[in-house]
């Protein structure tokens, strides 16, 4: 229920009914601006959570918007009226629908009753004209096959009229029950007492005499529109009088939904006009309103409203909302629209356009190339100099504010010449202004224009040098675009500049259509579209002149582009006032010349600069006005113009009169629509040059009249600032910028390279030696253009076509949908944007993606650890896992790395004798140097690690007589510390090769992996390096043993053969070299080509060392070293094999557990699927049962057209195979069945016996009190029951014959224009 609070902000007008209606709407909206209304008795309201800004942000406490049948309304929107049993007539197909029409303070929308889908929406600001169509509607409900339990008490008579009266009562009760089921879905409570009263009323109607048929038929008519007192009471709560629509209403209370069952009567004017429109229900005449709603965006819809209180009130509300004369700006819905911003505010469209930033981008200010020529003046900061100009604009630097003030008085509306754009390469400027006030001379205006003409521009010279600015040769083209019919009393050259006073200026007259010619062309176009014919329509469009006006605009645009881009001359555009055609032409020139304006952001800047800031009269041209800023008069003549005022006057003849402003009918013109249409033409001629698509332009046109945003309200920037629109309303640019990533708004063929815009301006280099003058040939111009092309588009004026997707949109209406965000999407014109103007992405739920993510996270540790040795040691792969699986994955990686190190050491120890060894791709540069200088033996291991290459040098030198063992020295303490630690462990192995030491090594490795969990992947590569170093050490030991044996042999031979020592030494050295090559080959598997040269040098050094060591004594400790190496290798192999077996067992167990879990999950999913299937089957069965109990309707719509002689019919099933809808036109209105006329005469003659029962065939709203009094009246009609029985017995013979004919008619596809007598008897 709405709250009944009074507000002081609303001003009521006693003379205008619309003022009171909109004022109450605004007062209610002010109350509900911070809290959404809740309508508890008409339809359920559900909370709808909008998508949050981020997943991490909390849910803010916000008032939830209202929901109607699972459809979300906009914030600040509430329902005014609900109308049941409305027929939505399709214009192209036969998918006519029966549903409910909702009217809110922003729009009206239609929801189908059977499918619960949103079919159509129309914003209140889009309403242009509502026209009544002549014709009638026939609705017939078939009999149900299943009996109803509520009809068991129908046999209260002991008469023999069961064949007729019981059938009628069954039909009545079934239609009542079905309709109550439909309407009860909108309510929250039921009233069984009233249902019982109505059923008792129907059961007792069998005792009536002559008024029997009338009572039954009247109750059946009530079953269509007012099926039962319970549903009727609910309808009256929402539809009877939610707001006082009388013109004399002066109350200040907000609209409320009355809980009392009150009824109102319709006006006599509407009754007289709708006398020919009838709605037949089971053969009983019922009036209907067939309405054709014409919108400003060329959309056409047709509704058929029931001719009762609710239908008439809905029609009156449409007429009142169609009036565009508002008493106050608070009556606009844009002032009530209040999206929730929360803590994080989205983009603010009011602050998007910054004139200083835009002029800096062009290079007019803030740049060394042009900052000395132009300046930004703030003389109009309070809108005193010109009320329709912006606060900041560009003028020449040499013009003072005094001269500017004098020049403004010489132009219409003080709109003096102002620079708005400069060419990037030629530096030619584009200016705009209005025409002069008279023929008198103004020196200040001449100085201003000369300063604009003398601006620095770049022209080609005769020499092949860099082009220089030339001021003396510059000419300024003054483009006069007013039409010849704009000043009929004077010549076309009046109020134009005198060339004698404006030196080096040329005037070009281009006659563009004025606002009156545009309006006439739009009217012709709308008539052709309303009566569209595929054969003649395209030729008739050419006769409207709309396409000719578009081609004229493109031709003048192309001519100005040649002056700016090809010739390098500045241009000044002006018309009479400079806010209609000047805006069109200036915007189109900049759109073709500057690629930045062809993007979404650039196009918004272009409209904000050229249209909004320079004072285009959006509200006046759209036919809207506010009484506070304009005077209102009554417009009684209707000339059929395509404006809101004309539509009001045309409707006033049929319904009620409305008030409009005098300027609304004469000053309306589709100026902005024509500009958007030309932009669409350019997108088709240059499909890769625009970032936005056709739907982007359609959204802008949709909100031109929707009154949802404050962007296009009022006529100037001053008026918007005075009415606080930036703070009280939302900007359309907020919606477009938040939804700019939407695929429907983007052009998939857009080439971004052509639209890359740099902020700095560049000088034009000389590319041709031919100067460009007025006598330059076209080839020379094209050569200059091609050499200095910057994405300039030259349109084709002849390639103009009709924008069929916009002007013929009624042929492709939006698809019906049941999604909760559908109503918001239709209201905004953009999908995937919520009511808070925040874009959200479509959620794609897939079970496989979730399972695959969990499976990949568990298996990534094993796969990455297995294949990590194929990568370089400095590459690291960090996997994101869940917190519960991190420990398991780390343990797996550590164990697997240990097993791999043991296995690799095993393989390497077994393959040392082989010449070719395959190893991982680890590139390490190693050099081996061994030197001996003294008789003592000292072993030194030095490991130097450098980046990017690791070099390990092993030096065997004897410098001191003592034996010393030194550890490694490192240069980088990051990764190489682990290698040094491993080398220390290997040295300990040489000293104590026992089993305890091996266990200590393993413990040390475990401690290392536990202390460095993040470097587990690095340890694998480091361990490989350790194993390689251990092999190198073993090979060195073998070499030492061989050398010692040779020394012993040489000492024995010296005693016997002293002379042959030198020869033997040479032979022995050769043998030693061959033995040294074999271990060196095993080392070269990980060396690069650079290390081979170092090995050859080391061999020469070994030969010299062996010669010096021949005289030394042998060392007996060599045998011990050989035994230690064999024991360590055998123990490492056995321990590694055991660890591998344990790891494999653990992995197998884990795999089994994972398989069991997956099987359990699959079983659970199967159970869930089965449950869901069972639920769906149950729901379908319940729906089928409900549909069987509901009546099935046949709708026949007959539109009267005297021009057509033959009837045209179209059929299609609505709710079942037996039901059908047929729509056809006929020259004659079908008459009633003669039996029905007999019934009417009988009802008129039996007025005394019928009591308070309404006997008129026309449907009128019968009070509930009359329905409750029927039982008392039935008791008084027992005397005439015998006569009724005799009449019914006479009709028994006719029923059997009529049933046969009725069955045959069910199989036919169409109905005759006039009902046959047999059908009438069957229905009776």
Curated annotation (Swiss-Prot):
The active site is at residue 575. GO terms for molecular function: phosphatidylinositol-3-phosphate phosphatase activity. It is found in: Cytoplasm. PROSITE patterns: PPASE_MYOTUBULARIN. Substrate binds at residues 514-515, 575-581, 621. Residues 144-180, 195-222, 248-276, 625-664, 852-864, 899-914, 927-973, 1025-1043, 1091-1109, 1244-1258, 1265-1294 have a biased composition (Low complexity). Residues 349-807 form the Myotubularin phosphatase domain. Residues 865-882 have a biased composition (Basic residues). Residues 883-894, 988-1002, 1144-1193 have a biased composition (Basic and acidic residues). Disulfide bonds: none annotated. One of its GO terms (biological process) is phosphatidylinositol dephosphorylation. It is an enzyme of class 3 (hydrolase). Its main location: cytoplasm. Residues 140-276, 624-664, 841-1043, 1066-1110, 1144-1213, 1232-1296 are annotated as: Disordered. The keyword Methyltransferase does not apply. Its EC number is 3.1.3.-. SUPFAM superfamilies: (Phosphotyrosine protein) phosphatases II. Residues 181-194, 223-247, 1005-1024, 1079-1090, 1234-1243 have a biased composition (Polar residues). Pfam families: Myotub-related. Belongs to the protein-tyrosine phosphatase family. Non-receptor class myotubularin subfamily. This is Myotubularin-related protein DDB_G0290005. It comes from Dictyostelium discoideum.
